[in-house]
Structure formats: structure tokens, C-alpha cells
Curated annotation (Swiss-Prot):
It holds the Pfam family Aminotran_3. Its EC number is 5.4.3.8. It is found in: Cytoplasm. The keyword Cytoplasm applies. This is Glutamate-1-semialdehyde 2,1-aminomutase. It is an enzyme of class 5 (isomerase). It comes from Mycobacterium leprae (strain TN). PANTHER family: GLUTAMATE-1-SEMIALDEHYDE 2,1-AMINOMUTASE (PTHR43713), GLUTAMATE-1-SEMIALDEHYDE 2,1-AMINOMUTASE 1, CHLOROPLASTIC-RELATED (PTHR43713:SF3). The lineage of its organism: Bacteria, Bacillati, Actinomycetota, Actinomycetes, Mycobacteriales.
Length: 446
């Protein structure tokens, strides 16, 4: 299958307008970006400045079009500028952007989430995944009266001071152990354990069980690359926390309402005490949520003593985008997402196998990552031990051919339901050259 005329691949000189825009941005924004992974630090080169997105296609400032396999890092399951979402946002925006007062859409979105997630009885809406995580951890400590939190190496839960230790996402991409500015005191009650090692969790609870407020884990990690939990792992976490009176917090910011209509819970129904949501539930707007058992959630102010607040929480425009996205995400959408992921993974694996490059493509539903590795990737250590140095050449070969993959091996690939035959044709054309570039890449010691 070849590319169609309407999907002409980029050609010609370097992305000159993006380069100039990046130069301008660097003069006023640290590093020229507002989230570090966007800077292409892990792959080199100048980040593309995107001016338009429709369906599965991105258009950059130079007018070049790309197949989008990032989907704004996950939220755009329907594709970009989906009419139902655009219409909902336009209608609400015409009536006002923010009121600082309750609106019906907040209740409607909360009810939609609760309807998809059986263990969730109450929802609190916030503005970002980081804010949701910070609030959930505070609530867990307030509810249990304990201080210590267990997190896992390679799992990323936003840029909360206490949870940045050994984190994934941009922290992994930039090879940072944590961050300057995170004090010892802020992280003193954080216990970092290797992911997928349930015995380490048992041993830690045996020593410190009466001090541990909660275990927080990504439902299926996507921030060290996609590294699914071992079978029964989340259920074992549930059993251990329940035995010791600690809470289980499952972070579904990435997986929530993407890998099924009920997120990872729909594939692996482990009833956490608290869940964290973002990305898809906001339809691409800045919104997130945390929710769970009523007994726990009702410790939040104004009902209880655990304080949490936000001027823009429940913003009506963001609520409209999220509600329209979830209502449009029928079962057929999830079937299409799974088919598209199956097709793309098969194409990737065939091209890389034909080229003779070692690779692993671990999956979490319709999310996946590409690691250049002979050995399976099961935790952060094995992700870091992959041939990370092959990825930049692979990435740029795809980008040059008009395919936009994630700009780090430690990030997830995301498909939308809008992927069309022209997009798959573009990918088919691009993959042999990208696989050859990965083979030809040479490791350079730093």
C-alpha cells in the first residue's frame, strides 16, 4: 500500500519555519518548550511546531503533514478536531469560559466516569494529572494517618516532589535521577521499589506496614515505555495493601478510557481505593480527576479536613470536551483502536524483523512501545538496558518520511480511531528505511 496524493510526505530542506519558531521560543521559554520531552532532547534535532491537526494528520509550520502516532501523548482517541468535540467546546465557550461556580457539566462528567468505573463512587475534578496525584497522596495520608508512600521505579505520576524519585517520562528521557529542588525532606517518606517485583513489596510491608499510607502505581506503566504489569501483579498489590490497612492508588492517567471504555480496570478489574484520571477524560483540554470509595473521598473539604481546591477546577470548556469525547467513545471506537494498534504493531515487527534489528514491542491494550532489545522489557532497569542509542535514527527516519512517532524510546505510541488507509500507506512506505536506519545506528559512549 502506498501513500496517496492527499498525504504527501515531507520533502526538501530542514524545517526552517519550525527552526525559527524554536529559536524565538528559546528566547522567552526555558528550553523553548513547556514540557521537556517536546524538545527532542533524546533524539536530537529541532522540534516541529504544529499549526493544525485533523483526524490522524498533523500539519507543521512549514505546511508538511505527518501521520500522528502520539495523539497529544494519548488523549486524542477519536482523532483531532472531532466534530462532536469541537461543536461541544464552541457551544460552551460562547456562553463563557469560566465562572468560579458549579456548573451542570461537572456533575455530568463525574457521573460519566463513575458509570464506567465500578469501584469509583465519588470524583473530584482538577486541572492536571500532577494535581490529581498530589491530591490523592495527600488524601491517602489524611485518611490513614500514616506518612509513607510506596512508588515504583520508572513509574511517573506527574512532577510532584515526593514522587519524582526514579521516575519515568521526561525524567527518564533526560536521564535524571530526580530533580534539583526536591528536598530530602520532601522525598523522605517515599519508598521506591523495583516494578513488577511483588516480593519486594511484601518485604517492605513486613518491615514498615503500619507506617505506609498508600501504594501508588500506574495501572499499566507507559512512562518508562510501555511495560505491562505481570499477570496478577495489581491484584497482589490490592491484597497486600488491604491486609495492612494501606490504600491502593492506581494511576490511570494514560490508560483511563483509552485501552477500554473502563480503562485498564476494564481489562484487569482490580478495585483500588483511589484512581487517577486525565488525558482522554479531558478530550485534550487541561483537566484531570481523582476518585474512589466514598468513605475515602468524603474526607476531602468541604466535607472533611483534607484540603484541596482549584480556581479553574471543573472548567466548563474542559468539561464539555471531556464529556463529548467519552460520549462519542462507543464500543466500536475501542474495537477500531485495538485493530489499528494490532495492524501497526504487526507492520513494525515485520519491518524490524526483516531488517534483522533486535526489538521488543510490549503492549498495554492499544498502547505500546518500541525497544531495541534481545531481552524482554519487564521493568525500568531492563528498559534502560535496551539499545536506546538506536532510537534517534529510527525516529528521524520516520519523521523525515512523514510519520510522527514519540520522540523517546521511554514513551508510549498512541493510535487514534481516525487512522486511515492513507496513513497506513505512509507508514508502510516509511518503515523499511527507518528499520535500516536503526540497524546502521552506532553506539557512542557518552
Amino acid at each position: 500500500m502506498g501513500s496517496t496524493d492527499q498525504a504527501t510526505a515531507p520533502a526538501g530542506p530542514a524545517v526552517s519555519i519550525s527552526a525559527k519558531l524554536f529559536e524565538d521560543a528559546c528566547a522567552v521559554i526555558p528550553g523553548g518548550v513547556n514540557s521537556p520531552v517536546r524538545a527532542f532532547s533524546a533524539v536530537g534535532g529541532t522540534p516541529l511546531f504544529i499549526t493544525e491537526a485533523r483526524g490522524c494528520w498533523l500539519t507543521d509550520a512549514d505546511g508538511r503533514r505527518y501521520v500522528d502516532l502520539v495523539c497529544s501523548w494519548g488523549p486524542m482517541i477519536l482523532g483531532h478536531a472531532h466534530p462532536a468535540v469541537v461543536d461541544a467546546v464552541a457551544t460552551v465557550a460562547a456562553s463563557g469560559l469560566s465562572f468560579g461556580a458549579p456548573t451542570p457539566a461537572e456533575t455530568q462528567l463525574a457521573a460519566e466516569i463513575i458509570g464506567r468505573m465500578a469501584p469509583v463512587e465519588r470524583i473530584r475534578l482538577v486541572n492536571s494529572g500532577t494535581e490529581a496525584t498530589m491530591s490523592a497522596v495527600r488524601l491517602a495520608r489524611g485518611f490513614t494517618g500514616r506518612t509513607k508512600i510506596i512508588k515504583f521505579s520508572g513509574c511517573y505520576h506527574g512532577h510532584v516532589d515526593a514522587l519524582l524519585a526514579d521516575a519515568g517520562s521526561g525524567v527518564a528521557t533526560l536521564s535524571l535521577p530526580s530533580s534539583p529542588g526536591v528536598t530530602g525532606a520532601a522525598a523522605a517518606d517515599t519508598i521506591v521499589l523495583p516494578y513488577n517485583d511483588i516480593e519486594a513489596v511484601r518485604q517492605t510491608f513486613a518491615r514498615l506496614g503500619d507506617q505506609i499510607a498508600a501504594v501508588i502505581t500506574e495501572a499499566s506503566p507507559g512512562n518508562m515505555g510501555v511495560v505491562p504489569p505481570a499477570p496478577g501483579y495489581n491484584a497482589a498489590l490490592r491484597a497486600i495493601t488491604a491486609e495492612h490497612g494501606a490504600l491502593l492508588i492506581i494511576d490511570e492517567v494514560m490508560t483511563g478510557f483509552r485501552v477500554s471504555r473502563s480503562g485498564w480496570y476494564g481489562l484487569d478489574p482490580v478495585a483500588a481505593d483511589l484512581f487517577i484520571f486525565g488525558k482522554v477524560m479531558s478530550g485534550g483540554m487541561p483537566a484531570a480527576a481523582f476518585g474512589g470509595r466514598a468513605e475515602v473521598m468524603e474526607r476531602l473539604a468541604p466535607l472533611g479536613p483534607v484540603y484541596q481546591a482549584g480556581t479553574l477546577s471543573g472548567n466548563p470548556v474542559a468539561m464539555a470536551a471531556g464529556l463529548a469525547t467519552l460520549r462519542a467513545a462507543a464500543d466500536a471506537v475501542y474495537a477500531t483502536l485495538d485493530r489499528n494498534a494490532d495492524r501497526l504493531v504487526a507492520m513494525l515487527s515485520e519491518a524490524l524483523t526483516d531488517a534483522g534489528v533486535p526489538h521488543q514491542i510490549p503492549r498495554a491494550g492499544n498502547m505500546f512501545s518500541v525497544f531495541f532489545s534481545e531481552a524482554p522489557v519487564t521493568d525500568f532497569a531492563s528498559a534502560c538496558n535496551s539499545q536506546v542509542w538506536r532510537y534517534p535514527a529510527f525516529f528521524h527516519a520516520l519523521l523525515d518520511a512523514g510519520v510522527y512517532p514519540p520522540c523517546s524510546t521511554f514513551e508510549a505510541w498512541f493510535v487514534s480511531a481516525a487512522l486511515d488507509d492513507a496513513a497506513f500507506g505512509r507508514i508502510v512506505d516509511a518503515l523499511p528505511g527507518a528499520a535500516a536506519a536503526a540497524v546502521a545506528a552506532r553506539h557512542r559512549e557518552s
